[in-house]
Amino acid sequence: MNGEQQLDADLGSGVEVEEFSWEDYLEETGATTAPYASFKHVDICLQSGFAPGMKLEVALRKDPETYWVATVITACEQLLLLRYEGYGEDRKADFWCDIRRAGLYPIGWCQQNKKTLEAPEGIRDKVSDWSAFLQRTLTGACGPPVALLEGLRNGRNPLDLIAPGSRLECQDFRDSVSTWIVTVVENIGGRLKLQYEGLERHDGFEHWLYYLDPFLHHIGWAAQQGYELQPPLAIRHLKNEADWQEILARVKEEEPLPSYLFKDKQVIRTHEFSINMKLEAVDPWSPFGISPATIAKVFDDKYFLVEIDDLRPEDHARRSFVCHANSPGIFPVQWSLKNGLHINPPPGFRSQDFDWADYLKQCGAEAAPQKCFPQSVSEHQFKENMKLEAVNPLFPEEVSIATVTAVRGSYLWLQLEGSKKPVPEFIVSVESMNIFPLGWCETNGHPLSTPRRARGHKLRKIAVVQPEKQILSSRTVHEGLKNQLNSPHSVMINGKYCCPKIYFNHRCFSGPYLNKGRIAELPQCVGPGNCVLVLREVLTLLINAAYKPSRVLRELQLDKDSVWHGCGEVLKAKYKGKSYRATVEIVRTADRVTEFCRQTCIKLECCPNLFGPRMVLDTCSENCSVLTKTKYTHYYGKKKNKRIGRPPGGHSNLSCALKKTSKRRKRRKNIFVHKKKRSSASVDNTPVGSPQGSGGEDEDDADDGDDDSLTEGSTSEQQDELHEESEVSEKKSCSPSPTQSEMSTPLPPDTQTDKREAQTSSLSDGENKPPSPKEIRIEVDERLHLDSNPLKWSVADVVRFIRSTDCAPLARIFLDQEIDGQALLLLTLPTVQECMDLKLGPAIKLCHHIERIKFAFYEQFAN
């Protein structure tokens, strides 16, 4: 795979698209959600199928091998409150059980399976003849269906029994009451995709119905009602009669779905409509207005045919649909006028103003009386500007966000947002089974069409970049983000949530955690766009630009004392082949972006202008050019007053021959001394010279407990970052003991004091000595004479010295990582290897020169 292909693959695998967030969308639009209780059909589908008073056989809680009869007292979704028979009205022994886990069986199961049926110990002596007692108790009792209990034992809800491939009966709701078999293609939360039996999927006769729809029934319903099973007229010509009968015979041999699944369906009452009665109606196939309509046919006392009036010649197709007495969308004449609504005159109507009195006289018809129509739902909780999820009437496979634009009686006017094609405002009943509460699609795994502006709000690109691919990948991911934010298909986000461009000012001081070289390779800016989206990308790039990404992720981790009140976003980091995750708080509004960036910079101990909405061209307002890796806290301080330890034997880089290397490294206890106040005349006690760490890296020792809050990826070994970072800190901090000549060299007062403190508060150097591949000896015959105090060397002075040695190729690293004299004096072999990515040979060679500087410092300037 070439570089470009690898890059494309990395980009493709590193991008995640998150789902639409209702919470963010409601905040942006200032809307409210329709109450969950308003969607009765959704609430019904969550019911378990159990009802108070049902009896069943249940295992005793103290003896699972023994069973007794219990009565359902209360059913609450998956929980049942049960009472054993014999306790009467005594509630003390009532108990709750999970219907999926408890052993629940129908009455008679114990006898069939030769199980012990015995009363609980608490009431065992209460009745002398339990057999007679049960016979009296169970006479006329009802229990849950056997299929329901079997399904629950297999981990299936009642609704799950309507699985793909199941057969049902469906009435033809266009022109007659003929009923035919349909096959369930999909079941999404009770919303069924159906196909007429005998047809192929590509025939175009698939349709969607909710499982409680009045026109959908269990197998056998037509025979019970006296209706004939025959295919609808629209498909009848596709096969001959013999083929249809063969299909019917095959279906009848199959075991049907249990009828109790449909027990909550609406009961159809008898109607009082007559042929030629006039009314107002909403065409269910085009529910965008109210039109005059006529009762064209009465099939029986339950069903009739409504036809939308059309005064044009007969060769035009008539729009008709089957109704029953409770059908929504039919109104008495003048209903529109009384509710201040417009009624669409029938096509071919010549007058501009439609008047019912004139129209009835013209047609010679009578209006259907008020008593024929269903009772209006007087109490519901829908209000204008509420949001919900609704089926697209033109494309029933699509569910979109909808806004209630008007409420009239028990009817809603909805406007879809985010549908694939524009759809006019349409009318639904408050009891429609094509509307759903907030989050229904997400809960049931149904795709939700969302507005483009909202979709842009939550689209996120997450770059989890390998360290060695950081430079190239970060640029590529940024280009993808830029293209997304500037896409012509995205609509401008609400200004309150629109983040300005965030610039990376790589000339500013990068601090102890961030690699200045990697910062310089980041894109110039990210954004503009949604605040959460842009800031998430910025923080991801910064984490990947760190010496130790997991350390920066821990610094950024959500603090319980946070004052931002933003949103928590899960960010990722990779370090040494392990993946880490942590929740980081990000502000959501544009007015807080500047301060958020500044405080994040301070938290990372870098220049407050390193990244933010302001581009630094030449001179930083913070004058951060005077800062080095060792001088940050003198100017900005630390957010937390952490205890920082000094590495034992900090004056020497290499192990000496005076002590043997310990065979096995022991875990060093984290005992620390307080940080001394910085003085320009003394060597800083904190290991800030480490390019990776400054004070922060040895804070790993003090903060190891914090790493438990980082979630390690599944690919890592079975140990947390606490152990990993302890080892790293140990390796860096446990420098070998000083040489004999060092020990005889007088030290500055502060240094001597600190050395005594470190020696009394830490374990012996013999225990802390890191393992080395072989004993390393350093001869210090080559005396070095220094013209200036290395403690006061600038970065340029350090680079100049390195270039004068045989380690000149490494000078660039010292320049990039801004290592000044103080930092140079604190470098150790483990630190050099880890932070400069040097192999052992070059690292030893470099440390040899650093050792010479240290000896010269002690001899010339220590006093």
UniProtKB/Swiss-Prot annotation:
Annotated SMART domains: MBT, SAM
Question: Chief subcellular site?
Answer: nucleus
Tissues/organs with expression = Highly expressed in the testis, low expression was detected in brain, kidney, heart and lung.
User: Segment Disordered: which positions?
Assistant: 638-773
Compositional bias per record (Polar residues), positions renumbered to this chain: 680-691
Q: Which residues carry this modification: Phosphoserine?
A: 764, 772
Pfam families for the chain: MBT, SAM_1, SLED
Q: Which Gene3D superfamilies match?
A: 2.30.30.140, SLED domain, Transcription Factor, Ets-1
* Compositional bias annotation for Basic residues: 660-679
MBT repeat placement: 20-120, 128-232, 242-346, 354-451
**InterPro entries reported in the protein's UniProt record:** Mbt, MBT_SFMBT1_rpt2, MBT_SFMBT1_rpt3, PcG_chromatin_remod_factors, SAM, SAM/pointed_sf, Scm-like-4MBT1/2_SAM, SLED
Which residue intervals are annotated with compositional bias (Acidic residues) in the record? 696-710
What GO CC annotations are associated with the protein? Answer: nucleoplasm; nucleus
Give the location in the cell: Nucleus
Q: Which segments constitute the SAM domain?
A: 793-861
Q: Which GO terms describe its biological process?
A: cell differentiation; chromatin organization; negative regulation of DNA-templated transcription; negative regulation of muscle organ development; spermatogenesis
Extract the GO molecular function terms from the UniProt entry. chromatin binding; histone binding; transcription corepressor activity
Give the quaternary structure. Answer: Interacts with MYOD1. Component of the SLC (SFMBT1-LSD1-CoREST) corepressor complex, which also contains KDM1A/LSD1 and RCOR1/CoREST. Interacts with KDM1A/LSD1 and RCOR1/CoREST. Interacts with MYOD1. Interacts with L3MBTL3.
Described by its record, this protein's role is as follows: Histone-binding protein, which is part of various corepressor complexes. Mediates the recruitment of corepressor complexes to target genes, followed by chromatin compaction and repression of transcription. Plays a role during myogenesis: required for the maintenance of undifferentiated states of myogenic progenitor cells via interaction with MYOD1. Interaction with MYOD1 leads to the recruitment of associated corepressors and silencing of MYOD1 target genes. Part of the SLC complex in germ cells, where it may play a role during spermatogenesis.
What domain comment accompanies this record? The MBT repeats mediate binding to histones tails; however, in contrast to other MBT repeats, does not bind specific histone lysine modifications. The MBT repeats lack the conserved Asp and aromatic cage at conserved positions.
Name this protein carries in UniProt: Scm-like with four MBT domains protein 1
Q: What gene name does this entry carry?
A: Sfmbt1
